[in-house]
Amino acid sequence: MIYRISHTTTYDYTDSISLSHHLLRLSPRNLPHQRCLHHEVHIDPQPAIAERHVDYFGNAVTFLTIEGAHKKLVVKSESNVSLMPPAVPASAETPAWENVRESGRGRQMGHSLEGSEFVFDSPLVRTTDDFAAYAAPSFPKNRPILEAALDLTKRIHADFKFDPKATTLATPLEEVFKNRRGVCQDFAQFEIACFRSLGLPARYVSGYLETDPPPGKPRFVGADASHAWVSFYCHGIGWIDVDPTNNVLPGTRHIAVAYGRDYNDVTPIRGVILGAGEHTLKVAVDVVEMKEPAKAGAAKSVPKRPSS
């Protein structure tokens, strides 16, 4: 399957901004089952500096500097991505979760080094006894780790209610756990906290989810949104993704953009500005399946001025 993704972010400032610096993490990753065929970013006003690099976690990052007075900033990311079904083992073929935990603790780590750094606390995800206790019923002795992960994912989906008004980016996980409400970011970070509280490595995945309109209803541009899910590490197999918001194993409708310890590592756009006043933020994400194959080529990330 091939998708066209449009992600437009608009900042409107009440007062003029004289200088701003921004980091963008908007380019879909290249993975065994996912290929970014094309990517470009349109910026208005035109940046004085636009440089691209790869961060510690392997995410494509674009650094921007906007000079000159401006009261609006528009960042439009456009991508074409090809997806195949990811290879996921049968639950019974995965090792017992205790073996995964011990593989990251022993001196024989070797191949487990990739996951070991995702066992520890991070700025937005803290391990606690309460989180471990919540996860425990899904992780009885000798249960295959994928079977346990799917059960935990199912329970979070059932126990927590999707409520965009319940949390902000600053809401602590303890409050999310207490109220059992939030959005995909909260559910992903809570499940990561559960894994890590049991000594299991897990990371945050940001990306997009293709969603279908209700039967008989038109598809609205911007109806889709950026999405978040979880990836846990299993020695001998690698990373396996689960989506607690939708209670699914991510497949050909999940498009990965960035990996990190938590949301702080994968923020789509962040930056600093020189100026006073307030600002409003508008975000529109559109994910459309393409009926005709897109022309394959090297993915690029080139800042451009919008034509409209």
Task: Cite the ranges covered by each PLM segment.
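A generic structural signal for well-ordered coil/turn residues at beta-strand boundaries
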Residues: 5-7, 20, 37, 60, ...
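Glycine-rich, flexible loop/turn motifs
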Residues: 13, 53, 93, 158, ...
